[in-house]
Amino acid sequence: MKKKIFVFMFLMLLVIGVSSSYAYLKAEKGSTGNNNLSVGSLDVTLLTDISNINLNNEIPKEDSEGLKNPSTSFRIKNNAGMTASYKISLVDGTKKSTVSNKDVKYRLIRTNANTNETVTMDIKNLDSTGLIDTGTIEANVIYNYQLVIWLDINSNPNGLVFSKNILVEGMQVSSLDKSGANYPELTDNMIPVYYDKASDTEGVWRVADRKNLNETYKWFDYNDFMWANAVTVKENGTTSRSDYLKADLGTEVKMEDITTMWVWIPRYKYQIFNGNNELSNEQEIKITFEHGIDKTGTVSCKENILTANDSSSSETCTDTINGSIINNKSTYTHPAFTFGDEELTGIWYAKFEMSTDQDSVCATSQSYDNCDKEDLNVYVKPDHISLRYQKLMNEFKSIRNMELFNNIHGFIQNENATTSSQTGEITNDDNNIDIHMQKNMEWGAVTYLAYSKYGKYGNSLYTGTNKRVYKNNWYQQLSSVYNYKTGYSGYSYNAAPSTTNVVLYNDLTDLGSGNGYKGAGASTTGTVYGIYDMNGGAYEYVMGNMVNSSGAFYSHNAGFTASPLAKYYDKYSYYSTKSLAQASVSRGRFGDATKETTKGYVESTGSWEGSYRIFPYYGFSWSTRGGRASISSYSGINDLISLNGYSTIFNSSRPVLAVSREFPWLSE
C-alpha cells in the first residue's frame, strides 16, 4: 500500500523582468488580488487570484481517481489590440520542488469565453520544462482554464514536496500571416530567410524578419503559399555564422555558405476523406491549423499490429464525437506532430533530398565502399548529387549524427555528446532538439499539406493535372555510375529522365495556361517556398517498417542489430506475400498518404497521380516514397514501394527536425 505524503501546491505568478518590447511578460499583484501581466503594448491579465492553493495528504493515484481532485480555475485575457502568443508553465519558485515533474500528472481544460469552444487536453505527465499550454490568444479574448493535478500511480515520492508557481509568458505574434499556423520554432543556429527574385531564373535568399511584421522582409504567409523557410550555415564561410545570426534584415545568405535548408510544417488537423478503406481520387484535403499543441480532431487511433499472414490493419481508430468515422465530417490531428510522448507545434522538413560534401570521395567517386558509411556529413541543398549507396541504417545514423557535438551546422549540443547508437540515442544528449530520418507519417504530413488549400493543389496558377507536384527528372548514367541531383524540375508531373529538359528549383518562368512556374512547380506549394524532390529525384527511404511474423522490428537487410526507439519509426502489420489486395493496402495508417490515397488495387498506377502502390511484405519490410527520376512515368508524392533496406544506387532520404516544446521567444 502506498504511504500518504504531504504535498503542498502553491500556485502563483512568477515576476519576470522586462528586457525589451518583445520580452517576457511582467506579473504584478494588484491591490484587488488580480495579477496583471504587461509588456509594452502587450497586456494579458490573469483575472483570478490563485495565490494560495493547497493539495494536502496526496497519495499516488490512478488517473480515474486523480481526476476527482479539486481543480484550479483561472482566466487570462488579452487586453492588447493585437494577437499575443503565450505559454503557461509550472515552475519552481522560492521553495524548490523535491518531487520530480515526471511523477506528477495533470489534465487541463481550456475554454474560449468569447466563443465557448472548449478543448480538453490529454492527460499527461508534467515534462521537464513544466509547460502545460502554449499558443496564441486573439485581442480581447478570455481563456478560462481548469487544471487538475495528482501524483502518478507509479511514483513513490514519500516525504517529498511539490511546490510550483504558474508562469505565464507572452509576446506579440506575426501580423503578416493570417492562416492560424503555429509560429515556426527556430533553434539558435537557424536563420529565417525569404527569396529575393532578380529575374525569372535568378535570385538569392536573404535574412527575413523573424517577427514577421515587416512586409519588405516577410518570412511566411501560408495563405499565399509562402511556407516558412530557414537555413543553417558554415561556421566560417564567406561570412561567419555569428555574423549571419546578427545580420541586418535583407542581408544575402550566400548559397555557398548554407549547409541545410528547412521548411516549417505547422501542426494541423485534417478532415477524413477516405475513412473506410475504399478507393479515392485526387481531391483537396481540408486542413485546419491547430493552436499550440491542441489535439482537436474527433478521431483517435491506437496501434494494433497484427502478425497473421494476411493482416488487414495496423491501427484501430474511433470517433467518439460522431459515433463512427464519417467521411467529410470526422477530423484527425495529424499524428506526425506526436513524437514519442511529446506533442509538437510543427516540424522542420528538409527542403531537398540529402547530399554530402560535393568535394568528398563519396560525391566525386560514388560507390558502396565510398558512401555506405555512418559518418558522412549531411547537407540539404539544391543542385547537389544526392547521397545514395547507403544501407538504411547508415542513412539513419548519418542523420542522427547531424546534432552531435561540433557538428558542421551549429546545432548546440553537450560537448560529451559525441556518439549515437542504432537505437537513435545520443550519449549525453541535452539540446532539446531531435534531428532524425524522415518517417512515413512525416512524409504523409507534407503530402496532405501539399494537397490542401495551402499547397500546390490550392494554388490557382496550376490547373488540372498540373496541380500535381512536378517531377525532378534530373538523371544521368555514366557507365555504372547513376547520378541524381537535388532541386530540379522537368516542368510536368511525369517528365522523362533527362539532363537537358530540366530547370532548377528557382526558375520562376510562368508557362501560362494553368502550367504555372517552370521550376517551382516541382515544389509542394508551386512556389519557391515549398519542399522539393518529393516526386522523382532518388527513391527516398522512410522509417516505415513492417514487423516480422513474430511482431518484432524487421530490419532485414537494413543493417540494424538493435531496434530503433519507437518514436523513430512507424510500425505496420505483417503480410507474407506481395499483394495488391484491399486487405494489404488497409495496413496503411491514417495520415501516411498510403491507404487513404489509393485509387486502384494495381501496382504501377495504384496511388494518386497514377504512381506505384506496393506495400511492404515478407522480404521487403521497408517503405520507399516518391519514385525516382530514372523511371519514365509512375512517380508522384503518393508513390509507395517496398524494399529490403539494403544500400542501392537509387535510394536517398532526408532529415526532419523536431524542436522540443520550447516557445520561440524573440530578442530585440
Give residue spans per PLM region.
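C-terminal, surface-exposed recognition/capping segments
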Residues: M441-G444, Y462, K471-T500, T509-L511, ...
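A surface/secretory-pathway sequence property marking extracellular, secreted
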Residues: G40-D49, V91-T129
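C-terminal, structured domain-capping segment
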Residues: G66-D92, I132-Y183
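N-terminal module-boundary/linker segments of secreted carbohydrate-active enzymes
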Residues: A181-S330, W665-S667
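Short, polar/proline-rich extracytoplasmic segments that appear immediately after membrane translocation
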Residues: K2-S64, N158-F162, L167-Y183
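Short aromatic-cysteine micro-motif
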Residues: E252-T259, T296-M534
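Long, low-complexity, polar/charged, intrinsically disordered or flexibly structured peripheral segments
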Residues: G275-D341, Y349, D359-C362, S367-C371, ...
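Extracellular adhesion/glycan-binding regions together with long Ser/Thr-
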Residues: N56-D63, N114-N144, V148
